[in-house]
Curated annotation (Swiss-Prot):
Tissue-level expression: Pallium, gill and liver.
Residue intervals of the C1q domain: 80-213
InterPro entries: C1q_dom, Collagen/C1q_domain, Tumour_necrosis_fac-like_dom
Species whose genome carries this gene: Mytilus edulis (Blue mussel)
PANTHER family: COMPLEMENT C1Q TUMOR NECROSIS FACTOR-RELATED PROTEIN 2-LIKE (PTHR15427:SF50), EMILIN ELASTIN MICROFIBRIL INTERFACE-LOCATED PROTEIN ELASTIN MICROFIBRIL INTERFACER (PTHR15427)
Location in or out of the cell: Secreted
Protein's recorded name: Heavy metal-binding protein HIP
Length: 213
């Protein structure tokens, strides 16, 4: 029957159209998914770049701060090195028959940070204005009484009195804090004619000083 055949044809064509629509819909969904995925990836990449830039900027600030701190520490070290003044000196050989106001040359230098003590003259010369601590120990042998003085710019600052009149060895120490100007000189001298000859200074004697601030 022709009519039946036509009806049968219509009945068989319907599924083909449905499959085609489903294919188109799937293709559309895939395109949309790709677009969404591309948008998501782009967003994540932008976010990652932003985070990296922020992290880099933060690190840059930290690095700059570290450089500044290192520079300040370097300046402090250089300041300390240039302002750290200290010395300690002894005698290589004993000194005998020291004359009045004669300088005792402590020629065996243990420490001389800042090079302010001059072994050739026996004088300490202040490299800058400040407060300085000085200590002097004088030892003398039997039958000798010896008076020494710490001179600051040729004026007595303190006296050291060593007495070995009834001892094999007599020692005395004294110390002082003085305020010095740059260029002021400090030395240990025989205190006039006071004492009992032979005015002998033992090698155990010392002259020490350092800058407080």
């Amino acid at each position: 029957n022709p009519v039946d055949d036509h009806q049968n044809d219509d009945h068989h064509d319907a599924p083909i159209v449905g499959h085609h629509d489903a294919f188109l819909k799937a293709e559309f969904d895939l395109t949309s998914l790709n677009a969404d995925l591309e948008k998501f990836i782009h967003h994540e990449i932008e976010k990652e770049i932003h985070d990296v830039e922020n992290h880099t900027e933060h690190n840059k600030h930290e690095i700059d701060a570290l450089h500044l701190e290192i520079k300040q520490l370097h300046e402090e070290v250089e300041y300390f090195k240039s302002h750290h003044v200290a010395f300690s000196a002894e005698l290589t050989h004993p000194i005998e028959n020291l004359g009045a106001e004669e300088i005792a040359h402590f020629d065996k230098v243990r420490v001389n940070s800042g090079d302010a003590y001059h072994v050739d003259t026996g004088k300490f010369v202040a490299p800058e204005e400040g407060f300085f601590y000085f200590s002097v120990t004088i030892c003398t042998k039997r039958d000798s009484i010896l008076e020494m003085a710490l001179h600051v710019n040729d004026h007595d600052e303190m006296i050291i009195h060593a007495d070995a009149e009834h001892l094999e060895l007599g020692c005395a120490s004294n110390s002082e804090i003085v305020h010095l100007q740059k260029g002021d000189h400090v030395e240990v001298v025989k205190h006039g004619a006071d004492g009992v000859p032979p005015f002998y200074i033992h090698t155990m004697s010392t002259f020490t000083g350092f800058m407080l601030h």
